[in-house]
Amino acid sequence: MKTAVILCAGQGRKMWPYGATRNKAMLPVANRPLILWQVDALTTIGVEKIVLAVDYRQEQLRSLLDHDPRIAFVSAGGCNGTAPALLAAWSTLQDPSLLLCYGDILYTAEDLRALLRLHQERRRPATALLQPLGEEKPNEWLCAQVSGDRIEQVLGHPRDSVSHRFAGVFALEKSMLPFLRANPGRMEAIQVGMMAPDEAHLEASLQIALEADHEIGAAQAGATLQDLDKPWHLLQANYAWGRHLLQSMERSNMADTAKISKRATINGYVLIGANSEIGDGVIIEGNVWIGKNSRVVQGAILEKNVIIGDHCTVRRYAQIEEGSVIGDRCFIGHCAEVAGVLMRNVYAYHYGEYWGILGEACDLGAATVCGNLRFDDGQTVHQVCGHRETPLLGANAAYLGDYVRTGVNAILMPGVKVGPYSVIGAGALVNEQVPERTLVYVQQQQIRKTWGPERYGW
């Protein structure tokens, strides 16, 4: 297949607070927008033309990719679901078959090859990439019951009776078009007592094809594939992709203009870009990737599988914990301890502890700390668009949207989310979700009395 369609039109409400300021395909994974990893994987397997179906915050995608001759854009405005968005894109093409990818999926070229191999062997109307559910709850996903290499039944957010969930990548023949057009506008393949919204899912069209006695293929995705649906999935994707990139390193790679002090302790391989420096007393405890024009100096500690972007400073005994990704132009200073994902231009200037995701241009006041261990040793239950769920990873992490600022000694309790353009004032303790564009501060009652030398007998 030489043509792929990527659906990037949705608003991504479940990804709040990060979906409030960006298209989900622009979410950063290992310091690159997700869409670039997708384009890389598609071109690796020989795809020559990629059509992006866009609507919400499409200007971000156009700014990034408009210059690329492989990329075309089609408007999916007004399309309520993946099925009509695909029809809008396919109507601009002459291809009898194509690859379809959702814009919030992180996949490898190996995932795509496994899908195409099965599809080309069987030549069914459609073949879907699927992942075993494992510990995940089926009622949080569009799911399928699988037998061998084919789908037996599609079920939307079921309680049980399924083994796999859809992984957001499909190989499709033009013979699927009648079933796309026959989509009823909501998922009718649900269990009794469940409720489906008015949204035309592609997976509903697959069930219609099954009921018309067509076979639908089921290819298995690798463990690295990630579906970025909610904030903790972004955390999980960065951890998984960092391991994918760094654990396979077999030697260090140092740019000619980079510097590594002989007084640094390095227990792993280092990929370090031009004009970057690893200084005296630095401790590196595994494989790391440091970008261009960055400084890791003055006793900073990096645990394994850490990625640091371009133009960063990590200094004065700061600690970056295992698997963390630090975006471009971040500054992490004296005794600051961070874990998770920091997007571009984040400042944690000195002292504090943070675990979770910090959105673009966040500014942490001194001694901002995150509580991530509850007294009941439990995991925080999150509300996602009215649905209560407990993430498998990152339930007790903090999630600060873009442009959030905190004052000195701010305290963020386990699982807190703060919307973009918000401020948490000095000394405030935040234990519940903060909406975007909100100022939270402490109104302190003070008692004043006279004092002086006479109090000491003078």
Where are these regions (language model features)?
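Conserved donor-nucleotide/metal-binding helix-loop-beta segment in metal-dependent transferases, i.e.
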Residues: 111-138
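Catalytic-core segments of class I nucleotidyltransferases/pyrophosphorylases
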Residues: 99, 113, 120, 150-246
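N-terminal nucleotide-binding beta1-loop-alpha1 segment
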Residues: 1-19, 442
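Extended, small-residue-rich solenoid/repeat segments and analogous flexible loops
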Residues: 199-201, 207-304
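Hydrophobic/aromatic residue at the end of a short beta strand that borders the catalytic acidic motif
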Residues: 101, 106-108, 172, 354, ...
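Glycine-rich phosphate-binding loop at the start of an alpha helix
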Residues: 36, 83, 87, 270, ...
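Glycine-rich hexapeptide-repeat left-handed beta-helix
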Residues: 315-458
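Conserved N-terminal catalytic core of the sugar/cofactor nucleotidyltransferase
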Residues: 2-6, 28, 32-101, 107, ...
